Structures are given as structure tokens and as C-alpha cells.
Amino acid sequence: MSYWSDPGKHGWDELWQNHPAVRAWINRRVTGDPEKWPIEWLPRVVPDRLPFRRAVSIGCGLGNLERSLVELGVVGRVTGVDASVEAVGQARSAASAAGLTDRISYVAADAWTFLAATRGLDAVLFHSSLHHFDRLADFLGLVRAALSPRGILYLDEYVGPARGEWTWRHLLRWNRLYRGLPAAVRRTRVIRRPINREDPTEAIESSGILPAVERHFRVLARGDYGGNLLAPIYPSLRRPDQAEGPSRAAFDGAVEFLLEREERMLGGDPGSSFHAVVVAEPR
């Protein structure tokens, strides 16, 4: 748990999804609208089940998702669950500052234990948290049991290769593209396997997420948004505000180039996406 005990160490601006062009691209691939985030897809996919009266967000972190759910009218009440006491404390403070404590609550708890004691939920949501869990078939069985028969599973997740599944083919593809970028944009000599050695739960069984979901749930909608190229390459791009960094135009141009390659790759192999948004109901 020590890795997640300091939420401030995980830089928001370092995430590839937060580049404006990338965010618009993801939104368009999932919702069809570059201005609408994936969570805004729910009213279109399951309009007859909203708002969710009782929802739980697993791995809530600092609480951004829960506040958005309330503000969009997707939930009546939502409980955020996270194993990090520090993250839960910050999420509570943010909910209080937004005046949302009557509709958002937080629990510092083990997700397995929490779900095993919970029944009758209208929704269970995961945002970049499910890929930290192992024994996925068992865990998603707990999620299914915690949901009502018409409950909804929502996930926005990394579903690509697990941490031990990277091959030389992945490295070859990434490094060929990386070497083709302007030298001013390249911060490192090569792209290495994207393994977070500080966090042994990162992508622990990620490639098993979709098969485990399909075992316990009926998928109502799925939106793939890649990350096969950008996710491993983006951390090695030199930012415009760094020492000897490229111009903003050069940096954004490199990102746009990678987005074009990403789009082309997904078009040729639609099932290969490393990231997906899934809306499903219990079988």
C-alpha cells in the first residue's frame, strides 16, 4: 500500500489521456462526441436505469469520478471505496468543499471485504482501478453478487497485456515509431517495457479483465480507445516546459502523429485495444 499512500506523487499531467488532443480523441471513440467524456455515455446506453440510487466506485482515489457522477445526475448516492486512507481523506475533503457530502460518502476498506458484505447495488464502477486486482473471475463474481439483477457494471480500464506479457514485438513497434519523432521531443534513448516496479499490482492480470467480465456479465456496450502506442511512448516525450524542451507545436505534433498511427492500427485490428470502456449487466 505504500505506493498509493501519497496520492500527490502520481502526476495528473503525466497521463497520456490528459493531453487535450488525446482526451478529445478518446471521447470521440467512446461517445462519438469529442466534448463528452465516457461517463456521459451512460445516459445513452442505459437511460431506463438512471439515476443509480445506490452506486459504488471501487478504487476511488481522490474522488474525481464520484463528483462527476453526482454533477451529471448519473447517481442518487455513491460510495467511494479505496484502500488508501490518505486518498479517501482527500476525496472526503473535496466532496465537502463541493457541498456534496449528502450524496457522496467514502470508505477506506479492502474492496473484497466491502463487496462481500454488500448487496442490492444499482451500479459498481471502476475507473483505472480494476487492472490492479488479481483473481479476476472470483473478484467479478463478488461484484455480480453485490449488484441487483438490473444493476450495471461500468469500467473504464486498461485491458492490455499484463505486466509479464510484454514481448520484443511490442518494443520493436514502439521504438520504431519513437525514433521517427523529432530529436527535440525524445527524452530517452529507447522505450522500455512499461512495468511499474514500485507498484506490483499494476497490470497484474489486466489481459484477463474482459474474459472475466464476459463470464459474469452481458456486455451492453463497449468503446475501445487504444493506448497501444501512446501509453508506453508518452512518458518518454520531453515536455515543452522542461529544460531544452521542444516547442509546444513540436510536442503537440508528435502527439497528433501518434494518434494517427493509433487510429490506423485500431482500424486494422479492432479487438487489439489496450483500453476500453464497458457497460454490462449481470448474467
Predicted segments with their positions:
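Class I SAM-dependent methyltransferase SAM/SAH-binding core
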Residues: 63-64, 68-101, 105-113
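Substrate-binding/catalytic lobe of Class I Rossmann-like enzymes that use SAM or dcSAM, i.e.
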Residues: 183-242
